[in-house]
Design a protein with these regions (language model features):
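C-terminal motif of bacterial Sec signal peptides marking the signal peptidase cleavage site
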Residues: 9-12
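Calycin-type beta-barrel ligand-binding domains and close structural analogs
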Residues: 14-31, 38-146
Length: 146
């Protein structure tokens, strides 16, 4: 999951609706486990809740996440479970071929603004901007713990 992390750059948990209302694929086993940021300051734990939903523990907070693939891009819908409003973050994540590195990036709210009223509107904007280099924020890299 690419997570501009603070709402997994999850200070990006600002959207009222998910990208997709249901997961678009199953949990990927290689993503599960404990991860540490490249600078060693942040810890990320990914667990499977069921066959399609991840539970994410990040910096003392819990999140629910699932794949929301759009326009051949591996988006992830991330929901903050600690807040009362349960808002969402939109991220991408990319697992390295050796499965030891996970890169996360959040969707830029200047390209996909808050206030979209339904998932169809979110999907339309993400599809339209899939090749836009401004779509994503900074990348955060995590290394898998042994």
């Amino acid at each position: 999951m690419a997570i501009g992390l603070a709402c997994l750059t999850l200070t990006a948990c600002q959207y009222d609706i998910p990208i997709t209302s249901a997961p678009t694929r199953k949990v990927q086993e290689p993503l599960l486990g404990d991860w540490t940021s490249a600078d060693g300051k942040e810890k990320l734990k990914l667990r499977s809740l069921d066959g399609s939903i991840y539970i994410v523990y990040y910096d003392g907070d819990l999140f629910r996440a699932y794949h929301s693939d759009i326009a051949e891009t591996p988006f992830v819908t991330v929901q903050d479970l600690n807040s009362n409003d349960r808002k969402y973050a939109y991220v991408i994540w990319k697992l390295s071929e050796d499965r030891k590195s996970l890169r996360l990036r959040n969707v830029n709210d200047k390209v996909v603004p808050e206030g979209i009223r339904d998932s169809a509107g979110v999907v339309a904007l993400l599809t339209k901007n899939a090749r836009n280099p401004e779509l994503f924020g900074e990348e955060i890299e995590f290394k898998k713990e042994k």
